């Protein structure tokens, strides 16, 4: 990744990098024939720490609105009322934040290389440049040698396809990335490997220099503590934050972290 690219995606200095303000969310429940309240005057502010990336984890039981929060910030859903801010500014109609879902999503008739290059080509980057930058990101996520394979099973495993999705989300150098239970569909062994892959990835200089903010939704408390600098625990009816935790663990972590008594 070129230095000129990485400097285009810096957070504001201080303040909140992501914020939800006075959010109301209702929908009509066809079973009860009444309005159901998801959020009632809900507020959440994720602080910006200039010069470092951060991993924010949102946990909570089903129905508390975790994925809805992600959809607000990515522009996939609007609240009934309230304000959504990104980098201190109202979320714009044409603004986009990349999102990786539980079920990996790829264009199966495209190669891995062309899947990863797609966000750049959609932005008008030449095919040659897009492929060059895509190849750099493919190396970062450990898929070098697979770039010419079709992005589908059985040519790639489920874990490899999630790496393709992550590489595609990062290739345009975003300063934010949203992950909605990205490992939920994987078996336990692959899930553990992907957790450490993500930990290693965001400590690599190619990614860390972008100082990204990553928002992860998970049900797994061990995953939350392993990856998160900030952990928000939610409850439902209506959705609300009941606890905010900053794990007493070093920002730089590796596999040995799970052997520490504090973990």
Model-derived features with residue positions:
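Short helical segment in ABC ATPase nucleotide-binding domains corresponding to the A-loop/adjacent helical element
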Residues: 113-121, 131, 135, 246
């Amino acid at each position: 990744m070129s230095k000129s690219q990485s400097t285009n995606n810096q957070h504001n200095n201080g303040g909140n990098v992501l914020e939800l303000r006075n959010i109301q969310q209702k929908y009509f429940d066809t079973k009860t024939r009444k309005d159901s309240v998801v959020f009632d005057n809900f507020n959440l502010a994720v602080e910006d720490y200039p010069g470092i990336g951060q991993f924010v984890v949102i946990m909570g039981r089903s129905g508390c609105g975790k994925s809805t929060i992600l959809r607000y910030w990515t522009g996939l859903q609007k609240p009934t009322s309230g304000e959504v801010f990104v980098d201190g500014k109202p979320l714009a109609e044409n603004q986009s934040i990349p999102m990786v879902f539980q079920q990996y999503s790829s264009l199966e008739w495209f190669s891995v290389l062309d899947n990863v290059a797609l966000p750049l080509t959609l932005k008008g980057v030449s095919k040659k440049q897009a492929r060059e930058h895509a190849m750099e990101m493919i190396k970062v996520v450990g898929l070098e040698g697979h770039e010419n394979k079709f992005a589908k099973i059985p040519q790639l495993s489920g874990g490899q396809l999630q790496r393709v999705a992550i590489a595609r989300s990062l290739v345009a150098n975003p300063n934010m990335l949203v992950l909605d239970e990205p490992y939920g569909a994987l078996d336990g062994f692959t899930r553990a490997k992907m957790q450490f892959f993500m930990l290693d990835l965001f400590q690599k200089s190619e990614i860390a220099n972008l100082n990204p903010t990553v928002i992860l939704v998970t049900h797994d408390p061990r995953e939350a503590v392993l990856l998160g600098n900030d952990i928000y625990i939610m409850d439902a009816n209506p959705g609300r934050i009941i606890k905010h935790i900053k794990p007493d663990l070093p920002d730089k972590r590796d596999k040995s972290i799970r052997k520490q008594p504090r973990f």
